[in-house]
Amino acid sequence: MLLEQLRRAADERQARALTRRRRIAHTACAPHQAVGPVDAPAPQPLLTFCSNDYMGLASHPDVVAALADGARLYGAGSGASHLVSGHSLAHARLEEELARWFAPHIPQARTLYFCTGYMANMAVLTALGTAGATLFCETLNHASLIDGARLARADVQRYPHCDAAALDALLAASTSPLKLIVTDSVFSMDGDVAPLAELLALAERHDAWIIVDDAHGFGVLGDDGHGVLQALGLNSERFIYIGTLGKAAGVAGAFVAAHETIIEHLVNTARPYIYTTAAPPAVAHALMASLAIIEGEEGRQRRANLNQLIADLRAGLAPLAAAAGWELGDSATAVQPLIVGDNAVSLALSARLEAEGIRVGAIRPPTVPEGTARLRITLSATHTAADVQRLVGVLADAVPPEAKREAA
């Protein structure tokens, strides 16, 4: 019975062009990467626009060397959870450095390191979203925030995308003793940024707290790459900030930055933190090298290059999208969605690009709402202007000739 049910579900996914398949990367994460299907005899060299390595640090020699040094110092694994014997000097130093970064934005800030961003989000929402609390969740939040809200014992209310007025009304009507606003900062499939200054004003008006997942902003936004709070110049003890260390930081893991009382509560009550083996100390050691690059002059240069590439890509894609009846999302970040609507069209465009040696993922429901299938184009600071021109050129060839004539 189980196998029959699963086969029917697989057939339904296939009929709706929703089947997902893994690919194998044969070389390091970089704009130019050798990739192949699981059963391919040899990988294909591809220009990739689908990783989240926004700062190009996953293959940075300093970070790679630090990872090796960390393994020599601390071994391959931690051996236990943080509360048993797995909390190493490398973990402690990483948390101290991140606390320094967030001291200007969260009074009495401390940080807590997690193995993954998913675990960090689950930990925060389940530890704070207890019975009697209410979570006010953005409709386009990441799946990990959605799942965390489902597992929390709190009441859950949803507000429309970036709609501060609707959130204001929900908060005003709530009698909950603990109100928690839950939002992405940079939305992972759209690239736009939550109105955090407005949300903070609402939090202060209604005595609420803000859980903000800055997975796609940390390392990229702000003069020093410290993320969305630095970029917007915000400071409040009401922020419970979650940053990812496997995207712009180029390694792995995540962290929570919050008032020290909140962090101490998580250490003692957050089950995803307590009941799992700590990440290898070598990873934390490598992240120290990554943070130094992000905050230093090289990081500033990389962010400047990334911002120029974003502008170049949007300038090239805007007329193509208009001609083809597609939508170029309103994004000023490294996540650039080209929304085509139909699932099959998104897959066909992705296949067309791959035939020309370019890899861009086709994103379909349930990851995005029905009717908004898209190419999710992501840029890295280590892409070049020529890389972007090549992508735009291939997409231009994919626009139907009749659409080009109508646009002309």
Curated annotation (Swiss-Prot):
Q: For the modification N6-(pyridoxal phosphate)lysine, which residues carry it?
A: K247
| EC numbers for this chain | 2.3.1.47
Q: Which UniProt keywords apply?
A: Biotin biosynthesis, Pyridoxal phosphate, Transferase
Could you provide one GO biological process annotation from this protein's UniProt record? Answer: biotin biosynthetic process
Query: Quick one: which residues bind substrate?
Result: R20, H142, T367
According to UniProt, this protein's pathway is:
Cofactor biosynthesis; biotin biosynthesis
Where pyridoxal 5'-phosphate binds, per the record, is at: G117, Y118, S188, H216, T244
Q: What Gene3D superfamilies does this protein map onto?
A: Aspartate Aminotransferase, domain 1, Type I PLP-dependent aspartate aminotransferase-like (Major domain)
- What is the required cofactor set for this protein? pyridoxal 5'-phosphate
Alphabetized InterPro entries for the sequence = Aminotransferase_I/II_large (IPR004839), AON_synthase_class-II (IPR050087), AONS_Archaea/Proteobacteria (IPR004723), AONS_Proteobacteria (IPR022834), PyrdxlP-dep_Trfase (IPR015424), PyrdxlP-dep_Trfase_major (IPR015421), PyrdxlP-dep_Trfase_small (IPR015422)
Identify which top EC class this enzyme belongs to: transferase
Summary of the function given for this chain in its UniProt record: Catalyzes the decarboxylative condensation of pimeloyl-[acyl-carrier protein] and L-alanine to produce 8-amino-7-oxononanoate (AON), [acyl-carrier protein], and carbon dioxide.
**Family assignment?**
Belongs to the class-II pyridoxal-phosphate-dependent aminotransferase family. BioF subfamily.
The subunit structure is: Homodimer.
Q: Which NCBIfam families match?
A: bioF
Name assigned to this protein = 8-amino-7-oxononanoate synthase
- The organism encoding this protein is Cupriavidus pinatubonensis (strain JMP 134 / LMG 1197) (Cupriavidus necator (strain JMP 134))
Gene name per UniProt:
bioF
